[in-house]
Amino acid sequence: MELSVLIDPVPDLPRLAEVLDELGHPARLDTIRRWDRAQQIKLYEAADGFKKLTLDDYVPSDKAPMIEVIHHGKNSLPAFNHFQKRFCKPGDATKTDTLYGYNHQSNAWATGPGYFAVKTADKDGEIDIDYRLTVPEKPSEWPEIIPNHDKLGRFVYEGMVDVMRGISKHVSIGRAKKKGKNMDAWFVLCREE
């Protein structure tokens, strides 16, 4: 669905969130895959403080530990811009302040799976997807955990944190930071139902 009229020239986030929430997953995914770099930048800036995110936005509270939840993504890079981030709760059900995940994408053979931990960010309402943290466990069907400094992952994941902001119930937008500095890399995620 084409919703650029709700983004350009200035994002109307309340209306955009309402429409995204009313769409089914296929239409929501089609919509976010149409958003270009300029629109992702606008949305990220506009989403500052708009919808407070919690870990439940990435893995709903009714999911058991080690059950995968898929978020489809589109980034602002010129190539390899469709991917998935797959999330789960830790095996220890009492550990409620962290999620685990990895990047499922076509060039994982070269970069590795890009494992990360997910925590609430220092800024209220934001979530950090942190590639600097070591993930100690994973669902059995996920790829082997390898350090993010192995393979070409050292150029992609090592030292990186994705700072996430909320747009709607299923859609969030992020910007990558490396070594504390913002990168010119944005992406949008859409959670599967």
What are these regions, as identified by a protein language model?
Residues 1-193:
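Soluble ligand-binding/transfer domains with enclosed cavities or grooves
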